[in-house]
């Protein structure tokens, strides 16, 4: 069974939910609450070391980064394909996905993490805890 860890308002989560719906796949809703910083908890970081949403869990194998999840779903569930068949149009689709990943996503992700999660998490740590964290994952 597929399980999707996501935020309701996340644009990256929305695009994965749209494809799940269009493919009519059954999935378990694992809604996280951004203000609770679940995505930065130890258990979630084991699923997704980047600490971002969404993360798709399929047979206990985590797939993360929304565009990678879209590709995974297209590759695995081929009954209904949403990729263009024409090679040129497929290249245009990929260019659009890169654009979405680079510009709007980064514009939203950086302030979300800086002010919404990481700043609070790091501010609550002692100097020793912060030093240990940096040694573990520079």
Spell out what each predicted region is.
Residues 1-137:
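GST-like domain detector, emphasizing the conserved glutathione-binding G-site
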């Amino acid at each position: 069974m597929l399980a999707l860890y996501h935020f309701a308002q996340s644009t990256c989560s929305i695009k994965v939910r749209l494809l799940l719906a269009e493919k009519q796949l059954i999935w378990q809703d694992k809604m996280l609450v951004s203000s609770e910083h679940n995505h930065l908890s130890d258990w979630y970081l084991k699923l997704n070391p980047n600490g971002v949403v969404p993360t798709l869990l399929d047979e206990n194998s985590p797939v993360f980064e929304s565009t990678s999840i879209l590709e995974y779903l297209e590759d695995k569930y081929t009954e209904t394909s949403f990729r263009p068949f024409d090679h040129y149009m497929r290249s245009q689709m990929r260019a659009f996905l890169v654009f979405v990943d680079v510009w709007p996503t980064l514009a939203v992700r950086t302030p979300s993490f800086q002010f919404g999660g990481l700043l609070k998490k790091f501010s609550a740590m002692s100097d020793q805890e912060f030093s240990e964290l940096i040694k573990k994952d520079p």
